[in-house]
Amino acid sequence: CNNFIDNVKHVLGDRKLDYLIINHMEPDHAACIGLVEALYPEVKIIGNKKTFELMTKFGFEINENSIEVKDGDSISFGEHEFTFLLAPMVHWPETMASLDKTTGILYSADAFGTFGALNGRLFNDEVDFEREYLLPARRYYTNIVGKYGPQVQNLLKKAHGHDIKWIAPLHGPVWRGNLDYFIDKYDKWSLYEPEEQGVLIVYGSMYGNTELAAEDLARRLTE
């Protein structure tokens, strides 16, 4: 939490923190809530009904300034206006995405995330994503939200009607271009459609005969 608080203080300077939007309550992201509340007791916490249920179960205080949002609600913060898209089970029940309509940045929580360190890089156009991160991204999807394809489809449909310029997930690079490439991957994965047409031949061979048969089958399939 120390690095997070240092970053917040660096950005704010002597100003107070007015709002804290909670997109996801998993402790790798939300463990610092109590410290934020202690340092900024007047902060208004924004979340959905499930967010506050989990906050209570995790032992965090819910102050009277808390703001509960529902799917599609918008809040204006002056220069910035946020719209909230609830995304239950992508991949926790309280998960939601927050769209800054002023900048077009979608803060997508765990959706569109990727395994792997970025090694000082931040944006998708700073890496060779297909070579370096597509496999970890596919593995991330499979492990984190792969079971919940219909829920991912719901989020994609909600986001489709908005002018999204950037996607900022909680893991992996921030997407500031070529968004359709990764959205198409998520669409295919969540529909359980293959990215490429092919046949997987799985076999076990104690004496090598089944292996020969499998190789012969593979050759015939390529013809």
Map each language-model feature to its residues.
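Metallo-beta-lactamase
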Residues: 46-169, 175-176
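Short, surface-exposed basic-aromatic patches at helix termini and helix-loop junctions that form
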Residues: 10, 35-42, 60-61
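N-terminal beta1-alpha1-beta2 submodule of the flavodoxin-like/Rossmannoid cofactor-binding fold
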Residues: 179-223
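Pre-active-site segment of Zn-dependent metallo-hydrolases
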Residues: 1-20, 43
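Di-metal (Zn2+ and/or Mg2+/Mn2+) metal-binding site signature of metallo-dependent hydrolases
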Residues: 4, 16-37
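Conserved beta-strand hairpin/beta-sheet module of binuclear metal-dependent hydrolase folds
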Residues: 1-10, 97-100, 104-108, 199, ...
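Active-site neighborhood of phospho(di)ester-bond hydrolases with catalytic His/Asp-centered motifs
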Residues: 17-25, 45-48, 106-109, 167-171
